[in-house]
């Protein structure tokens, strides 16, 4: 007779969860940040709000963003004027867009990841799909399963409305799935489209305007599994440890509410201050067991909520400017793509490390950290181990 403990042992993988492939995708419509205020105030019929436009111009100038990608083109916005007003009932219109576009963009990223992985898609055992852009039944996970032609018995997990920290959440969940299910290959997809949050400017709600200056569209996909098959699967990063915590005294720091007018976004407190205040504790918990206390000796992937968060974290930890290079590069080229951002940064880091001839995927360093920040205020921490190039 076989014991339960023997069954459990046989069910578990031996090695750590490993990122085996990364793919990214964006809509074709590229928006230049320098000219965006003119476009935004024109398309929303708000050109008479001269002072507000000047404020928005300053926000865009200080954002450290050069460009973003958006599904919403001038043509789409002209056809759907309710989306351009500040709080006009427009949820139906927005939903009709995102329930199609979110899985479609996710598919584009997933196809790239599967191609890099080099294995048949029939070997995918689990799917994690994450979006803060719209809600539907059956969900975006189901739609993606159909679009990709995955097996009907793939084990699916749908994460709706998590917000900007969720790039860390999907890695945490993928790690647990890969390590506890021998031979599992998890397809992870984060797909975000700002059609749910786009709206005209308001004199009284400047936090909404901050979102209009920062958010962009993008999807990222990973293949995660333990015990990579030698010569066939090529490891990129290993995931060693994960944690999630709610920062103390941070209730209401970042809120999002699904309303008739779409997803409304609220920044109620000093978010950069809360993040920088709590980052030390998160790092000690993560790296003390590894005897690492010099945070310049590790590689960094942080969700770029905005430049102020990165500036304050750098200052608090006395980080060298190059530590946030990959993070700032992604913010500059794509804006804040919510949950997809940290996965884009993983991709940017491994590509630049290889291009520069460095020894590992993590800028030549062995250990690294990935941080997700978002509503709650919730902090996700992932300890990464790089792979030799």
UniProtKB/Swiss-Prot annotation:
Pathway(s) where this gene product acts: Secondary metabolite biosynthesis; flavonoid biosynthesis
Keywords: Acyltransferase, Flavonoid biosynthesis, Transferase
Top EC category: transferase
Catalysed conversion reaction: (E)-4-coumaroyl-CoA + 3 malonyl-CoA + 3 H(+) = 2',4,4',6'-tetrahydroxychalcone + 3 CO2 + 4 CoA
Gene3D superfamilies membership: 3.40.47.10
InterPro entries: Chalcone/stilbene_synt_C (IPR012328), Chalcone/stilbene_synt_N (IPR001099), Chalcone/stilbene_synthase_AS (IPR018088), Polyketide_synthase_type-III (IPR011141), Thiolase-like (IPR016039)
PROSITE patterns: CHALCONE_SYNTH (PS00441)
GO biological process: flavonoid biosynthetic process; polyketide biosynthetic process
Top-rank lineage group of the source organism: Eukaryota
Heme in keyword set: no
One Pfam family per UniProt: Chal_sti_synt_C
EC number, UniProt record: 2.3.1.74
Molecular function as annotated in GO: naringenin-chalcone synthase activity
Active site (catalytic residues): 164
Function: The primary product of this enzyme is 4,2',4',6'-tetrahydroxychalcone (also termed naringenin-chalcone or chalcone) which can under specific conditions spontaneously isomerize into naringenin.
Family: Belongs to the thiolase-like superfamily. Chalcone/stilbene synthases family.
The protein's name: Chalcone synthase 1
Organism phylogeny: Eukaryota, Viridiplantae, Streptophyta, Embryophyta, Tracheophyta
